[in-house]
Amino acid sequence: GKGAKAVPGSGALRATNAATAAGYVLASELRACGVDFSFTPVLDLDHGESGVIGDRAFARDPRVVSLLARCLMQGLLQAGMGNCGKHFPGHGAVKADSHTDIPVDKRSLKAILADDAAPYPWLGSVLTAVMPAHVIYSRVDARPAGFSKRWLQDILRGQMGFQGAIFSDDLSMAGARQVQGQSLSYTEAVLAALDAGCDLALLCNRSVGGGAELDQVLDELAEAAVKGQWQPNEVSEERRLALLPSAAARDWESLVRSADYMRALDLLP
């Protein structure tokens, strides 16, 4: 009737409630197992192009993606966990798999900001971290977003005002270390990511062999600091610490018996 407020349909309410429940279950289970951070949510749009993104995306519409991501992040927060929106400014419109190749998105900056990147400023007040894409946006910068000062410092920090932590994507991926025709070593890739504006660099699945490759990177970073090629950043360290949970996690047995956990399970599809 006149003056009455429109309310979402039951399907929409189920979707948002399920997203919050999924965030809570994910974060509470991880924390009960000793894991204090998860690189979620995926904010990429489902253009039907990317096999590596695919059903990891919430939807094609950036408004739907933002709504469901916000609900999921609320669930993460209820369990004491931060979040990481990825892959900035959007990985869903390219076919190539950035784990092995270097995808190229030829759209204009205006088109990207109006569509794929739209969730980032919309969620700016609740995003605690962002992970850039290993994608080249050729009409914006010749370097992949994760190595691009234009994307990370000028656009994400400057234009969008993001103040949280910026993680590199996994630099152990072959496609992640290709920059302007050069294949970078692990240490070179880490330094390039930090120089571009990342606060933290990820080098995953390199703990084999006693972690010798990781030790080498740390040793070479120390050498680079002595040579003046890189210096630890106090602000980056503050951003990292801000991602850590402030309250103790439940143990597994008490979690799975808790009423809020069981209610969350009931809300999942």
Walk through the language-model features, giving the residues of each.
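Active-site-proximal loop/short-helix segments
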Residues: 1-5, 36-56, 82-103, 133
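Nucleotide/pyrophosphate-binding catalytic subdomain
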Residues: 5-12, 20-24, 48, 54
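Glycine-rich anion/phosphate-binding loops
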Residues: 11-29, 60-68, 110-113
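Acidic-leg catalytic submotif of subtilisin-like serine proteases
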Residues: 26-38
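Active-site loop-helix segments enriched in His/Asp/Glu that coordinate
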Residues: 50-66, 210-215
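Second-shell residues forming the walls of enzyme active-site clefts
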Residues: 70-242, 249-253
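C-terminal extensions of enzymes
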Residues: 248-269
